[in-house]
């Protein structure tokens, strides 16, 4: 009786899901059945072949001038699993290698050489990705969860089938079904698919969940737990990590296939998931609540019927605010139907920080019923400004504070300093400098006219007293310069050169005297006109003690008056909409206000 008929539970011939397992027992399976240390592999169907290890270029890796032979076996450890779940690797033992020469002589005598294998790796297929590296050279590529990659080339014996690599290709296709896009959820087929194919693909995708990426990053605790016999037997994984609890159950073909839940009391987290219907309806719901993180809820529902696909997704996240913390809330919903292809999305966001709140709302709709329509609406509301929050409780809205900044009060003449931009400040400075030049020119003109008038009066006095005290005026250099012409004109009994000089200076003094009289008359008229204008301006101007300064002495008086030349103002309106929200509307014009300092100086003549 063969070994195949001795299998009491089930054999590879009774495994109807895959034809690759309908083969005779190999060396590894026979060894595990006869004297294996793992009872779980004793009655499990296995598909095995011999490979040699190569590199990526296809070159054979030689270790000590010998080829490394590897036996790869794909095992299904439980009859309730639709697909195999474990990959085993074995290699010849050292004792077997030492007796290779003896095996050659034994083979010549008609006896088969004894070949002993030892298991070196036991890997769940969840953490191994098998792919075809080279079809012509019959090479496979193994990508482990740790990131390591191995390349194997099929090395069949002489008595094996020629199409052995075709079975490996079919097995790789079953373990890695081609899907449109990889996702973390199981692949759901339409209702027209056969029940067996639907079952196989869904289970394969469940086993391949999280292993679609090339990086293959997994936690060490997951890898260690998955290598246990409980996982290999299809009983699932139950482990605790970082104070969390999770549970999973294998999927079956009956309605209400799987129900799982996880809860964590310390963090206030609860997760629940259900799968109903003939592998077409899935519902997942989760919630996490904590005083620090708030609450979060996500729900997903997908149902497939004849000619109709419906998907709904809703989520919400809330963060509880503290004294100086902000709070945000968002909500969204989406609905897709194959009949009319409609989509709806609603979202809201709110932020509150010490009296400042912002809210937004949007909606979009898309429908395909021989027409296309879309709509969106949004609003932003701001209640307070940052300046009012720093200074104290707010009295008015944001625009009211802007209205009171940047202009001078007409009552007290004081100017409230704001913080304008650099460009506006430079323009204002240039205007002030330009306007400050004109009063300085006028005051210098008045001072020059007064000095010339006093000089002419002094010249007249000096002319009258030049005959009496001509020698007394020769003590200082300044008096000589100012009174030179009068002294020369007073010497009537000099030389011929002096007489000619006397005549020329006499004429010049007469002309200058006449011009001085004309200029003095015109200057007095201009001064009278300007004095009348200044008096009218002073009457119209509201002078305050803080803006006017007077310096008096026995012979002069100085007045400093501040005049408003420009004004800056911003007008705004604040209206309340429905719901108590304040809406700000800015209207009016904006002008600038500046002041100019005018200096009046009066001296006694």
Swiss-Prot record:
Classification via Pfam families: GARIL_Rab2_bd
Asked whether the keyword Cytoplasm is assigned, the reply is: no
Q: Where is the composition biased (Basic and acidic residues)?
A: 475-484
Compositionally biased spans, kind Polar residues: 463-473, 513-526
Query: Which stretches does UniProt call biased (Low complexity)?
Result: 239-265
Q: Which residues carry this modification: Phosphoserine?
A: 592
Q: Record keywords: Phosphoprotein included?
A: yes
Biological processes, Gene Ontology terms: acrosome assembly; binding of sperm to zona pellucida; cell morphogenesis; flagellated sperm motility; penetration of zona pellucida
Q: Where is the composition biased (Basic residues)?
A: 434-457, 489-500
Please tell me which stretches of this chain the record labels as motif Bipartite nuclear localization signal.
Answer: 441-458
Q: Where is this region: Disordered?
A: 234-265, 407-529
Any Gene Ontology CC annotation: Golgi apparatus
Write out the annotated subcellular location: Golgi apparatus; Nucleus, Cajal body
Q: Which InterPro entries match?
A: GARIL-like_Rab2B-bd
Write out the entry's keywords from A to Z: Golgi apparatus, Nucleus, Phosphoprotein
Q: According to its UniProt record, where is this protein mainly located?
A: Golgi
Q: In which tissues is it expressed?
A: Expressed in adult spermatocytes and spermatids (at protein level).
Role noted for this protein: May be involved in RNA biogenesis.
Quaternary structure? Interacts (via N-terminus) with RAB2B (in GTP-bound form). Interacts with FRG1.
Member of which family? Belongs to the GARIN family.
Q: Can you say what this protein is called? A: Golgi-associated RAB2 interactor protein 3
